[in-house]
Amino acid sequence: VFQRPCMEQLAPISPVVYYSALSQMKSLFDKTKAGAIVLKNRFVRASVGDHVKDGFVSAAMIEKYEALARGGVSTILSGYTLVDGNEHGHGITAMWSDEFIAGWKPLIDSVHSCDANIILQLVSVGSGYNSPADPSMPLLGASAVPNMRTGRIPKAMTLYDIERLKNQFAEAALRAKNAGFDGVELHAAHGYLFHQFSTPYYNRRSDAYGGSLNNRSRLTIETYQTIRKEVGPDFPVWIKLQSQDG
């Protein structure tokens, strides 16, 4: 049974360390910039998934994001959002076609009305997903290696699949820009597709997308570059990375 230690059991904190930490945090409420966007403070709400029907924004989502913005954070990261309709399911929000833009607009407006920014997080789940929306379409991954979480064995992506994916991300990012988002973030962590390419556990490829760390990072970097060409030099494009394979 876990027992919380009493205060007497905790090592004393040096006053020098305590006040040094406070001095480092004093800028939390200061205005700053992240690329082209202005942050009214240093508080950023991390991405948490939203469960919705058919990938469309719900009224409950709009209410939640507005409440988060009213709470005072400078920037909110959306829940992960799919760029490929074949990965649709499990209530994940979507931006793989223009039909989703109108649903995002009132959510964006509600966040902006509270003087906050909103970034759309984009993802491809790869074999980190249980089943494709179209059963005739295979799950895609870096290599045909069983997924530790789902047990599914994906089809190793061809160069055509890779080019298609990069374009899907670029098109979704442009939709985000046109909808009014302040930027996008590529989800390259937590066992999803970009992460599957970056780790040697899943990536057993012998082509330009496998082997060295530079090669395993190539898909993420090239996707960023493809997005950048589509959205222009000033639109923020962030990347969420993971430092370990777990």
Language model features with spans:
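Active-site-proximal loop/turn and secondary-structure-junction residues that shape catalytic pockets
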Residues: 49, 82, 124-126, 188-190, ...
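Active-site glycine- and acidic-residue-rich loops that bind
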Residues: 53-56, 166-167, 175, 209-222, ...
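Non-globular sequence segments
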Residues: 117, 123-181
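N-terminal capping/small domains of soluble enzymes
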Residues: 6, 22-123, 165, 173
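Aromatic- and acidic-residue-enriched carbohydrate-binding clefts of CAZyme catalytic domains
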Residues: 83, 92, 131-157, 196-215
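Alpha-helix-loop-beta-strand connector modules within alpha/beta enzyme cores
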Residues: 93-116, 204-236
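N-terminal amphipathic/basic-hydrophobic helices that include classical n-h-c signal peptides
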Residues: 1-24
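Short beta-strand segments at enzyme active-site cores
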Residues: 76-79, 118-122, 179-193, 234-241
